[in-house]
Each structure stands twice: as structure tokens, then as C-alpha cells.
């Protein structure tokens, strides 16, 4: 279900008491994507821009520090810092935490999501969401990844 904003405009015609009521419906298409978004780079920005182009409102769910520990992942930036960075990006309308793998169906329902977007390295992993929304896997940006950045930084420091 979409968010519907109803604007009402009253127009007085020829100084009479007659009024016309116009209703204009605006339906927002909502998109969601998930990730850690640590060491933000142009591949992330490219994903966020393409996701935003698929709708009017982009929700980004980022892995909480606790969830990263469960996945045996270590982030350089804390959840709060990653959230602050993402909120400053013009393509992003809302940032929410990702605490578990299982929360995606609930997020899609709670935020009335129309399109679920992930990189194609996750191809097929979220097809179960197709009964709730459209699922799109976008090609990854070639030549960049957070893992590559971390490895390059380690190599430079040696």
C-alpha cells in the first residue's frame, strides 16, 4: 500500500459562495536497500542513486554493530556514524537499523515498500520477498569494494 497525500484546494468563483474542491492524489513509490555501508565509496553512491531512481522515497537499512558481530563482520565506523553519513546523502530519505536477517518482511510491510533493491552479488537470496514487493538485483560497480579498500589500506601500511 502506498502513502497517499490528499491536497484540497478551495476556489471562490465570482465572489459567490460556490466552492470547488479539487483533490490531487500523489502516490509515492518507496524503495528499500540494505547494507553495512562502511568506508563509503562511489560504488555505494552508485547503488543509492540507482535505487532512488526506481522510486520517490529511498529507505536504507544499515547493519547495526550488534548484527555485524553476529555476521562476524567488523566495521571501521560505528552504526551511528554510518547512519549520519548516509543521512547526509541526497538520494537517501530515511535510514533504519538492520538487526537481523529475518526483519526484511516486517520492514517491507512497516514502511510500505514497493521495490526491494540489492546488489547482484545477492541474486536470488531475497526472492521470498516477491510476494510482498518487486525485488531487483542491480549489477555491482566494477573496480571498487569495501573489502578491496581495506586490503589496499593494509598493504600500504606494511
Would you name each region that the model predicts?
Residues 4, 8, 12-16, 21-158:
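Nucleotidyltransferase catalytic core that binds NTPs
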